[in-house]
């Protein structure tokens, strides 16, 4: 029998608006600290998000501007960026996405097991969860970049999560907001709902989805289903997720 037993949440851009509210200013603060004559604007950073991982973005941008950065310098920039990111999180400068807290609370009350699967480091995730949810931690475990050898878009993070949870794939749902994340969860053969972040994204042609939402919604901000089952309420809730699993199962058969 198909029923909702577990939800795997991506973090950056899915649970919280971290990319523009924390990661981007942290990068620019690091450049300033180290005397690197860069200042990424929003459009530049959005383009760089196609590259997965902070160190990879620094290396890619350096190459694109014909600058010869050593691995040591790239590592130093990234370490400094991480410091500034944590400082920004401590100041509670990051907001939850619309409907996230409401849905997480409802799933918790329904005894649906919840997990985070992210490319962020464990120190980043722990601090962000602590600041966003205070004493309430609904997540059973976290798969971070520290826990796997290969990050998204490789399926390994989600395969590890499935192994640890023991939940049948067809009884779980993934929430993702990016091409690398979607490729990771789909390659792991997990039912996946795409909820875009506040950053424009063009889905890669080889990504085939059966559920796309513009947001999770709440009482004052209605969710729109771009693709998938109909909403019973103005927002995504436990019933909708169960409907989606049936929809997903029927689509496969």
Predicted stretch roles:
Residues 30-32, 53-69:
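Helix-loop "lid/cap" segments that line or gate small-molecule binding pockets
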Residues 1-43:
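Active-site neighborhood of HAD-like aspartate-dependent phosphohydrolases
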């Amino acid at each position: 029998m198909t029923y909702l037993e577990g939800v795997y949440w991506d973090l950056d851009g899915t649970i919280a608006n971290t990319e523009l509210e924390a990661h981007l200013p942290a990068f620019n603060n690091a450049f300033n600290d180290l005397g690197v004559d860069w200042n990424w604007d929003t459009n530049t950073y959005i383009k760089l998000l196609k590259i997965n991982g902070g160190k990879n973005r620094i290396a890619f941008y350096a190459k694109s501007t014909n600058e010869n950065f050593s691995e040591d310098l790239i590592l130093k920039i990234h370490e400094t960026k991480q410091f500034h990111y944590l400082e920004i999180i401590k100041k509670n400068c990051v907001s939850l996405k619309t409907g996230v807290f409401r849905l997480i609370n409802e799933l918790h009350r329904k005894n649906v097991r919840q997990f985070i699967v992210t490319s962020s480091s464990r120190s980043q995730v722990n601090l962000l969860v602590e600041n966003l949810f205070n004493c309430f931690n609904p997540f059973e475990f976290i798969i971070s970049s520290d826990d796997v050898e290969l990050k998204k878009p490789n399926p390994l993070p989600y395969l590890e999560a499935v192994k640890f949870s023991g939940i049948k794939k067809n009884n779980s749902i993934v929430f993702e907001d990016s091409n690398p994340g979607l490729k990771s969860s789909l390659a792991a053969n997990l039912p996946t709902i795409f909820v875009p972040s506040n950053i424009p994204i063009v889905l890669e042609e080889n990504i085939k989805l059966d559920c796309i939402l513009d947001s999770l919604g709440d009482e004052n901000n209605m969710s729109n289903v771009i693709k998938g089952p109909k909403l019973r309420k103005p927002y995504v809730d436990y019933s909708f997720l169960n409907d989606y699993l049936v929809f997903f199962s029927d689509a496969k058969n």
